[in-house]
Amino acid sequence: RTLATMAACSFMFSMVQMSLTTYLVTYLHDDLAYGMVSAGLLLSVTQMGGIGGRIAWGVVADRWMGAQKTLALLACLMALSALATALLLPVMPIWGIWAILLVFGASAIGWNGVYLAEVARQAPEGKASVATGGTLTFTFLGVVIGPPLFGALSSAFGTYRAGFLALVVTSSLCAWVLYRLKPSAVMPAPE
């Protein structure tokens, strides 16, 4: 059950990650009138957050929270960041936008290492590669499905804000599911 839940959440996490990196520049340019270079720089800030997040979240999971609670925290941060991104205004101070996008990147791009380590830990003994491959099927399905859904919602509502608001819903659902998931022991190997 834990591996299935992790796979489902990775599906949604990858939807958030790929939608963010696919549409952020266009959103900043089209909806907020940023120049392409400035919008690209802000995407770089998001990516830098992801680099730092991959390292920092591993430490947080190992030393303090455990993987499941860290992933629940990351889902909360994704939801809050997606909401803040949907509510961005052109008159906001640039440092505020940098901060929002840094946290968004740290959570939406930085989740993968904690997730993969937990999948390997939850796998039956000797089956980590099978569990990882199986769950990554769902992860990459989210990569394929997420951006077109985000784009369709944005087109239907005439703004990229709608897509970011949809990410709030998916991230919040994952946070709730992961928070309620009972920490489970490592599964024994099948006989």
Which sequence ranges carry the predicted segments?
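Helix-to-loop junctions at the C-terminal end of transmembrane segments
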Residues: 53-66, 154-155
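C-terminal transmembrane helical hairpin of 12-TM major facilitator-type secondary transporters
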Residues: 67-118
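A late C-terminal transmembrane helix in Major Facilitator Superfamily
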Residues: 120-159
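Multi-pass alpha-helical transporter architecture, strongest
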Residues: 165-191
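Extracytoplasmic gate region of multi-pass secondary transporters
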Residues: 2-58, 112
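Helix-to-coil boundary motifs at intracellular loop junctions of multi-pass secondary transporters
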Residues: 27, 31-32, 63-64, 118-123, ...
